[in-house]
């Protein structure tokens, strides 16, 4: 820190120079991110609520009301009229909260002290963080030939210490939806906590269904589902950080509650103490501003771009790994390693990522990627081919 103050002009000049090194979503060349540029109206509202603290809701009753309304609105999308939950920093925190709820609930009501969680091999790395933080043993269920969790593998791995089963609605690498209906039945029959990580698909699948896309049930319409992660800062167009965790029952929050004697509420269940209300307010605003019609149009456009890109790849001669269920396309060159292809694309200014299972170039078709961007990308891929 400098001894003497520096002018705003000089500080902003320095920050602008530093920020120029960042990649911008608006360039359309960030291809591997599940996040995108927030809607301008959501950004405006976010700034309006910067000083609100949901960690002390008695002081910010209006903002707490907004959070409750957002959870209720998301709950309606996920087939539950009275959900419980919070707007948090993202899918990682939401998944950690879900695993903490599962562990604490099993410890209180089943006496399980050394818990195990069954997750697919395709699960997000946040579950490894959760297991490490809460001393849970991870049991990785195998994937089937379609890269979805193998139901038989889940059955085989259930034990007396199983505190949770996890399924994914929109896998990180391929955007696939696990057989959640079958897993819900298994979890329900065995009285095991069942969590659905719909961080990616939760703000897309409900709207795609409304415009004619077919998806099996994945939400609270299934009696075995105990909690769902959903991220407004992905397809919801809310600013980062805005994640959501919804629970079927209040008791899942209660088993995580700790005393907070010097605040305006007696207990607190979230991991983070001080929580900005800005994310809740921005999510509230953009959900009202876009409405069902706006999100249906957005989801439809993303899938149109997905199909356009997939068909373009196949015309050139690239191998598409799986038929896209959501707006992710994974592909390979028939005669080139994925990492080598990624390097060539990076040299051309495209920011791609490489999936690990299977190894393939992974492109996430988010809102900042236009059809023209995809045409330019396909042209470069043609030259590489």
From Swiss-Prot:
EC number, as in UniProt: 4.1.1.11, 4.1.1.25
Catalytic activity: L-tyrosine + H(+) = tyramine + CO2; L-aspartate + H(+) = beta-alanine + CO2
Cofactor(s) listed in the protein's UniProt record: pyridoxal 5'-phosphate
Modified residues (N6-(pyridoxal phosphate)lysine): 234
Entry-linked SUPFAM superfamilies: PLP-dependent transferases
Record-linked InterPro entries: GrpII_AminoAcid_Decarb (IPR050477), MfnA (IPR020931), PyrdxlP-dep_de-COase (IPR002129), PyrdxlP-dep_Trfase (IPR015424), PyrdxlP-dep_Trfase_major (IPR015421), PyrdxlP-dep_Trfase_small (IPR015422), Pyridoxal-P_BS (IPR021115)
Name of a matching Pfam family: Pyridoxal_deC
One Gene Ontology term from the biological process aspect of the record: carboxylic acid metabolic process
Gene Ontology molecular function: any one: aspartate 1-decarboxylase activity
Domain of life from the UniProt record: Archaea
Pathway this chain belongs to: Cofactor biosynthesis; methanofuran biosynthesis; Cofactor biosynthesis; coenzyme A biosynthesis
TM segment ranges: none
Keyword annotations of the record: Decarboxylase, Lyase, Pyridoxal phosphate
EC supergroup of this enzyme: lyase
Known role: Catalyzes the decarboxylation of L-tyrosine to produce tyramine for methanofuran biosynthesis. Can also catalyze the decarboxylation of L-aspartate to produce beta-alanine for coenzyme A (CoA) biosynthesis.
Family of this protein: Belongs to the group II decarboxylase family. MfnA subfamily.
NCBIfam families listed in its UniProt record: tyr_de_CO2_Arch
Protein name: Probable L-tyrosine/L-aspartate decarboxylase
Organism: Methanobrevibacter smithii (strain ATCC 35061 / DSM 861 / OCM 144 / PS)
Gene that this sequence comes from: mfnA
């Amino acid at each position: 820190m400098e001894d003497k103050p520096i002018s705003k002009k000089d500080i902003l000049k320095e920050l602008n120079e530093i920020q120029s090194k960042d990649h911008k979503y608006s360039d359309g060349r960030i291809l591997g991110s599940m996040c995108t540029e927030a809607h301008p109206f959501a950004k405006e509202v976010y700034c309006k609520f910067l000083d609100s603290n949901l960690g002390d809701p008695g002081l910010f009753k209006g903002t707490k009301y907004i959070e409750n309304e957002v959870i209720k609105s998301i709950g309606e999308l996920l087939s539950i009229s009275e959900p419980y939950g919070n707007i948090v920093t993202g899918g990682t925190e939401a998944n950690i909260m879900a695993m903490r709820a599962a562990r604490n609930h099993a410890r209180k009501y089943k006496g399980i002290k050394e818990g195990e969680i069954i997750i697919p091999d395709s699960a997000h790395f946040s579950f490894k963080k959760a297991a490490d933080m809460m001393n849970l043993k991870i049991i990785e269920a195998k994937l089937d030939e379609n890269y979805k969790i193998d139901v038989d593998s889940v059955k085989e791995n259930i034990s007396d210490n199983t505190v949770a089963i996890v399924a994914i609605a929109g896998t990180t690498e391929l955007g696939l939806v696990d057989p959640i209906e079958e897993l819900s039945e298994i979890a329900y029959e065995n009285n095991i906590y069942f969590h659905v990580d719909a961080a990616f698909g939760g703000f897309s699948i409900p709207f795609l269904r409304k415009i004619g896309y077919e998806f099996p049930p994945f939400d609270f319409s299934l009696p075995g589902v105990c909690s769902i992660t959903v991220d407004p800062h992905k397809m919801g167009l809310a600013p980062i950080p805005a994640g959501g965790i919804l629970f079927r029952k209040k008791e899942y929050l209660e088993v995580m509650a700790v005393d907070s004697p010097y605040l305006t509420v007696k207990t607190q269940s979230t991991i983070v103490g001080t929580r900005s209300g800005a994310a809740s307010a921005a999510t509230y605003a953009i959900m009202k501003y876009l409405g069902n019609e706006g999100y249906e149009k957005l989801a439809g456009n993303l899938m149109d771009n997905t199909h356009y890109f997939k068909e373009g790849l196949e015309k050139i001669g690239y191998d598409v790994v799986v038929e896209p269920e959501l707006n992710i396309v994974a592909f390979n060159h028939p005669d080139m390693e994925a990492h080598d292809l990624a390097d060539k694309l990076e040299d051309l200014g495209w920011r791609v990522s490489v999936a690990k299972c299977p190894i393939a170039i992974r492109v996430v078709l988010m809102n900042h990627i236009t059809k023209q961007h995809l045409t330019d990308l396909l042209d470069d891929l043609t030259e590489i081919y």
